[in-house]
Structure formats: structure tokens, C-alpha cells
């Protein structure tokens, strides 16, 4: 088997496994959706629901937007310094940086 046939065989097997995986996902989603619709008919939960109602207090938050701009000036501190971005962060050495991919 020559190298091209090996590459085509590996690609075909990979593509077949991907198709099988997608098919299994579709089947799993279908079974889940059908199972939820079948079992979702007004069942009572065994949970205890506690509701706290206070009829005397009503809290509302009203937010109104106006066409205003808020500009906040921040003073620059004298102690700030910035990195020199013209130099590399780490000095890489070796031949792998200049090699070809194939």
C-alpha cells in the first residue's frame, strides 16, 4: 500500500467514524426529546415548595434612560510604566522555528 492510499484510508475511516458519531448524537437527542414529551404529563414533584409573600411591602426598581453622556476623567499616575513591545517576550532558540510544516 503506497503512502497516498494510506492517507486516503485513514481519512475515510475518520470520516466514517465522524458520520457514525453524528448519527448516534441525532438518535440520542431524538430519544431524549421523545422521552421527555411522553413522561412530561402533569406529574407532581416530591419537592416542598415554600413561598414567602409579604403583602405590605412592594419594591420596584424603575430605570429611566436619558440621552446624556457621562465622561469620567482619570488622572494618570506617574509611577506607571509600560513594556517595550518591540522586543520578544522570550528568546526562542533552535532549528524548529525555521523548519517547514511538511
From Swiss-Prot:
Mainly localized where? virion
Region feature (Involved in apical transport and lipid raft association) = 11-33
| Residues annotated as glycosylated | 46, 54, 84
Give compartment(s): Virion membrane; Host apical cell membrane
| Cofactor remark | Binds 1 Ca(2+) ion.
Q: Intravirion topology: which positions?
A: 1-6
Region Head of neuraminidase: what ranges? 89-102
Q: What's its EC?
A: 3.2.1.18
Any one GO MF term held by the record is: exo-alpha-sialidase activity
Q: Which reaction does it catalyse?
A: Hydrolysis of alpha-(2->3)-, alpha-(2->6)-, alpha-(2->8)- glycosidic linkages of terminal sialic acid residues in oligosaccharides, glycoproteins, glycolipids, colominic acid and synthetic substrates
- How does this protein lie in the membrane? Single-pass type II membrane protein
Show which residues sit on the Virion surface side of the membrane. 36-102
List cellular component terms (GO): host cell plasma membrane; membrane; virion membrane
Renumbered residue ranges of the record's region Hypervariable stalk region: 37-88
Give the keywords, sorted: Calcium, Glycoprotein, Glycosidase, Host cell membrane, Host membrane, Hydrolase, Membrane, Metal-binding, Signal-anchor, Transmembrane, Transmembrane helix, Virion
Q: What class of enzyme is it?
A: hydrolase
Cofactor(s) this protein cannot do without: Ca(2+)
Protein function:
Catalyzes the removal of terminal sialic acid residues from viral and cellular glycoconjugates. Cleaves off the terminal sialic acids on the glycosylated HA during virus budding to facilitate virus release. Additionally helps virus spread through the circulation by further removing sialic acids from the cell surface. These cleavages prevent self-aggregation and ensure the efficient spread of the progeny virus from cell to cell. Otherwise, infection would be limited to one round of replication.
Quoted from the entry, the domain comment is: Intact N-terminus is essential for virion morphogenesis. Possesses two apical sorting signals, one in the ectodomain, which is likely to be a glycan, and the other in the transmembrane domain. The transmembrane domain also plays a role in lipid raft association.
Query: What does the miscellaneous comment read?
Result: The influenza A genome consist of 8 RNA segments. Genetic variation of hemagglutinin and/or neuraminidase genes results in the emergence of new influenza strains. The mechanism of variation can be the result of point mutations or the result of genetic reassortment between segments of two different strains.
Subunit and partners: Homotetramer.
Q: Which family does it belong to?
A: Belongs to the glycosyl hydrolase 34 family.
Q: What is this protein called?
A: Neuraminidase
Natural source organism: Influenza A virus (strain A/Black duck/Australia/702/1978 H3N8)
Amino acid at each position: 500500500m503506497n503512502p497516498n492510499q494510506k492517507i486516503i484510508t485513514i481519512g475515510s475511516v475518520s470520516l466514517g467514524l465522524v458520520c457514525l458519531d453524528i448519527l448516534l448524537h441525532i438518535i440520542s437527542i431524538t430519544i431524549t426529546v421523545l422521552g421527555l414529551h411522553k413522561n412530561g404529563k402533569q406529574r407532581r414533584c416530591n419537592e416542598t415548595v415554600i413561598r414567602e409573600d409579604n403583602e405590605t411591602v412592594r419594591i420596584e426598581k424603575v430605570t429611566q434612560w436619558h440621552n446624556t453622556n457621562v465622561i469620567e476623567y482619570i488622572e494618570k499616575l506617574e509611577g506607571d510604566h509600560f513594556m517595550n513591545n518591540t522586543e520578544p517576550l522570550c528568546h526562542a532558540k533552535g532549528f524548529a522555528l525555521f523548519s517547514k510544516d511538511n
